Amino acid sequence: MLSSTFVRSKAGLVPVILAALILAACTGDAPQTPPPVNIQDEASANSDYYLQQLQQSSDDNKADWQLLAIRALLREAKVPQAAEQLSTLPANLSDTQRQEQQLLAAELLIAQKNTPAAADILAKLEATQLSANQKVRYYQAQIAANQDKATLPLIRAFIAQEPLLTDKAHQDNIDGTWQSLSQLTPQELNTMVINADENVLQGWLDLLRVYQDNKQDPELLKAGIKDWQTRYPQNPAAKNLPTALTQISNFSQASTAKIALLLPLSGPAQVFADAIQQGFTAAQNGSAVTASVPVTPNVTESSPTDTAAVVSDDTPATLPAPVTPPVVTNAQVKIYDTNTQPLAALLAQAQQDGATLVVGPLLKPEVEQLSATPSTLNILALNQPEASNNSPNICYFALSPEDEARDAAHHLWEQQKRMPLLLVPRGALGERIAKAFADEWQKQGGQTVLQQNFGSTTELKQSINSGAGIRLTGTPVSVSNVAAAPASVTIAGLTIPAPPIDAPVVSTSSSGNIDAVYIIATPSELTLIKPMIDMATSSRSKPALFASSRSYQAGAGPDYRLEMEGIQFSDIPLMAGSNPALLQQASAKYANDYSLVRLYAMGIDAWALANHFSEMRQIPGFQVKGVTGDLTASSDCVITRKLPWLQYRQGMVVPLA
């Protein structure tokens, strides 16, 4: 039997338990308290979650949830929805909310490709008032808004975000800083003004100067970088060099003791191969060196009417002589005819013969085979495949009209032209040239390029006799998706896909916005094309005219030069007057056939590139000043040529400053 004390105690507990149960039930029926909101922190949930919280929250928290939803929508590439939410934010925001709103507005504008407006907003934000997470987004927005051109704000943004990054992002940031610095021109670097307390930036600028002063000598560059690391031990790049400079630490000079020269010494291409071989041999023996005596120029390029600066087509304007001297060595060269055996067999034979470097092949079908032909030999191909592969032992050196068109795209862009029309011959050659130009044009930020084809000289004569001019119209050049598509934007580690490309708008009027015409024509064709353009345009709307070296041949007298008044054209430095003695020697050898003279020059530069193969392959920015152009290598070792440009003025040919 239970004691009366126990019964009373148990009975006393009943009301307490009942009250607790009732309280628990009431608590369960009450609405849940929403989680705390911190708009300055990470926003890792999806937009649906934040939008749901926005609907369920009280008025005090609605703006916070809406700001988080906008961030999530941008992360999910739902740009229109993000813009709609941003436009409906309440006007009475707190200072913290206002900062987040401005940061989101800048990120939205970047996603919409309106980087100038984004940069204006970012310039008004005070970074010191932002949280660590917001600072990362702020600096990455600064980088995205200034990515079109290397500027001081862009470089400062890279430097400022470095302490906020972790793991692999550190190296990516260092590489991005270096890439931006490398795009600065010498003039921009020399005129740059920085604050006295910007020690990290000063270190970066000194590293750039070390690189620019010594990049032509790998050993000096190695020593310079090591000294820089000692002087700037706290700089992020002192601990982790940019990837491009890390390669220099591992630089090794490849042997050129035995060179295999692969050319089509028989068949239809023999005449071209012979010219290249003779140039290669002349450079090897030093005969091209004796002809390379610098001639002191007596021109004043800034004066368009200075007759001391002008010469006829037979005596091109004197330009500075190449600063990269041809290499004279005791290398052995053995020549192989690519028309006698398959390419794979020739490469195997060359390796068996002890070759350490291959120069060639020349013809594009054989160059296309290189990537599928296993060989450990270093190879300097004398042409370029349609799609180059980044093979660590192959470089590509082409003297092609496509290569010249790519240089023309840069020249027209530097001349502030933005609406070019290409006049190219009908057929495969014209299509290749147009595509090469348009690809390079769009890489620089240019828009649609228009193309117009022309037929034979007979057709042109018929048109001009009928009084028909050439109207400034054309069809859009079809370019590769990689070149044509705008890049996506990454902000705070979030990649926003590029917007769809609108269909190009084609000018249909001769009084449209075309401001430049690039013409690929022979002298006889250009003689007809230029007056036909003049017939169809007024003097006020006349575009600038540019031509390729195809229009510059021997035998063009003063009448032709007068007719070509104002046209700018490009050619290799040898033809532009960099070395008159060598030009005279080569012209005599080939009876003034300028096409063969250019191939002879290609052979000279092929020798120079062969002897600097390791530098071109391993040192970014290494340059050979050759007789076919200023030669540099892309990341996949495609040799690019920067050409001199000349202009017809008052019956003379003058170099452009």
UniProtKB/Swiss-Prot annotation:
SUPFAM superfamilies: Periplasmic binding protein-like I. One of its GO terms (molecular function) is enzyme regulator activity. Transmembrane segments: none annotated. It comes from the Bacteria. A lipid is attached at C26 (S-diacylglycerol cysteine). It is a lipid-anchor. It is found in: Cell outer membrane. GO terms for biological process: peptidoglycan biosynthetic process; regulation of cell shape. Residues 1-25 form the signal peptide. It holds the Pfam family LppC. GO terms for cellular component: periplasmic side of cell outer membrane. InterPro entries: LpoA, Peripla_BP_I, TPR-like_helical_dom_sf. The keyword Cell membrane does not apply. Keywords: Cell outer membrane, Cell shape, Lipoprotein, Membrane, Palmitate, Peptidoglycan synthesis, Signal. Interacts with PBP1a. Belongs to the LpoA family. Regulator of peptidoglycan synthesis that is essential for the function of penicillin-binding protein 1A (PBP1a). This is Penicillin-binding protein activator LpoA.
